[in-house]
Amino acid sequence: MPTETLQTGSMVKPVSPAGTFTSAVPLRILNKGPDYFRRQAEPNPKRLSAVERLEADKAKYVKSQEVINAKQEPVKPAVLAKPPVCPGAKRVLGSPTLKVFGNHAKTESGVQRETLKLEILKNIINSSEGSSSGSGHKHSSRNWPPHRDTTELHRHSFAESLKVYPTPGRGSPQESSSHVSRRLLEQSAESFLHVSHSSSDIRKVTSVKPLKAIPCSSSAPPLPPKPKVAAMKSPDADQVEPACGVSRRPSLQRSKSDLSDRYFRVDADVERFFNYCGLDPEELENLGMENFARANSDIISLNFRSASMISSDCEQSQDSNSDLRNDDSANDRVPYGISAIERNARIIKWLYSIKQARESQKVSHV
């Protein structure tokens, strides 16, 4: 072995395991002890909210000492105070009520409970109206009628509707019925009172429909039947009604000159197509007018059926008054000539004959 390797081997010292551990882990962590690791395992302490941090730093951005010393308390929802209830009312409200059989009147305890509830609601309304008395409305001076049971009201109204009040003999039946309906309306308006859960919804029902009383007395003569409205209308009223209603827009009307111009153009086009087969005047001069003599004799005498005549025929067919009338109208009609299909076939045949004559003339000249 060379001597250099022996020297280097003697210089290297063996490393103990304790030395490796101490070099890898710093001594300051080992000296802290187990409490240090326990504190890290625990959850973080409670953090301050933004309001608390601003409260702590208030002296930095607030100048007045009063604001610095004052503390802002959180806003709490307003709690509605319950109305005071007397001990007698508590006992009445807490006492059990008897069951009602057959929907008859309530027991005395139930009636007292309803009256006490109504008094409590009236006290609440009076107190709220007393605070707003500066507006000029004196609502607290109202005297609310006592609340009645619904079954009692129905029985009362039904009994009153059956009653017929005596009227003097000279009075007309219309006056007696009006008196009865007026009395019933006043009593029903006074008796009805709508009470809801909220104090502001308590109101007196005044919009009650008037009750129609049926007169039961045999002495009163029967009412005459009402005359029909259609018979009462006069011709003057018929003239006034269209003026009051919405006026109709006049339909579009063309002038006579425009219509005559249109009809003239249509007649010229029809004459040119059917009489001269739609040919231009130059072509007609080349072919010769004598060739159109037969076509004119066949076509000029035809009666063309317009759209207006077709619509009038449809209207006449819809009229189903009598068979004789339809037969007379059918006899009065002017007999038409050949059909449009046959007329077109003749024109096509005649044009084909002209074409053949042209070709034969060309062949003869060649």
From Swiss-Prot:
Q: Where in the cell is it found?
A: Cytoplasm; Cytoplasm, Cytoskeleton, Microtubule organizing center, Centrosome
Residue numbers carrying Phosphoserine: S234, S297
Has UniProt tagged this entry with the keyword Phosphoprotein? Answer: yes
Query: Which Pfam families does this UniProt record tie to the protein?
Result: FAM110_C (PF14160), FAM110_N (PF14161)
Transmembrane residue ranges: none
- Region: Disordered; residue ranges are 127-150, 163-182, 214-253, 313-333
Q: Which InterPro entries match?
A: FAM110 (IPR025740), FAM110_C (IPR025741), FAM110_N (IPR025739)
Name any GO cellular component annotation: cytoplasm
Q: What name does UniProt use for this protein?
A: Protein FAM110B
Q: Which organism is it from?
A: Rattus norvegicus (Rat)
Taxonomy of origin reads: Eukaryota, Metazoa, Chordata, Craniata, Vertebrata
The gene for this chain is Fam110b
